[in-house]
Amino acid sequence: MREYKIVVLGSGGVGKSALTVQFVQGIFVEKYDPTIEDSYRKQVEVDGQQCMLEILDTAGTEQFTAMRDLYMKNGQGFVLVYSITAQSTFNDLMDLRDQILRVKDTDEVPMILVGNKCDLEDERVVGKDQGQNLARQFGSAFLETSAKAKINVSEVFYDLVRQINRRYPESGRRQGQSNKQCCSCVIM
């Protein structure tokens, strides 16, 4: 079974942990408890293929910056999360993406831009069009999500698996060859 390393990145309080825990455990975490680093594993089926996702839920971008390069180096795919209720979290994404590209030393990195908390429409300050435009500029996918309302949560991770499969196709293996292959995704 192919493994995928996904890293979730973004500013503090945007809902990185809420998205990850909702996807992995089906639970919405109400209480904000800043993350240092948590790792989750979940087996899923994407397009008829069994996949093992290793998801690294990271600290907010303003914390533990020394560890971030290591996450980026090891990740195969990245979820860049902002809150639609906080403009500053959206503004942080450009630097975050630039750092990923610098560490990976390539412009072609599986990545999805995620506007979280779309259930809080009354508190929206970042328009959906802004997210779509930035994703277009990045050449990445874009989704608005709500961990609380379970909107587009699984789709984020499935889309990233598909991107990783396109970017790093599994070479045909003869019987008896090792089945171990690892791919990484980072969610910011």
UniProtKB/Swiss-Prot annotation:
It comes from Caenorhabditis elegans. Required in the hypodermis for proper formation of the cuticle. GTP binds at residues 10-17, 57-61, 116-119. The gene is rap-1. PROSITE patterns: RAS. A motif (Effector region) lies at residues 32-40. This is Ras-related protein Rap-1. GO terms for biological process: cellular response to cAMP; collagen and cuticulin-based cuticle development; epidermis development; negative regulation of synaptic vesicle exocytosis; Rap protein signal transduction. It is an enzyme of class 3 (hydrolase). Belongs to the small GTPase superfamily. Ras family. The keyword DNA-binding does not apply. It comes from the Eukaryota. GO terms for cellular component: plasma membrane. SMART domains: RAB, RAN, RAS, RHO. The keyword Acyltransferase does not apply. Keywords: GTP-binding, Hydrolase, Nucleotide-binding. CDD domains: Rap1 (cd04175).
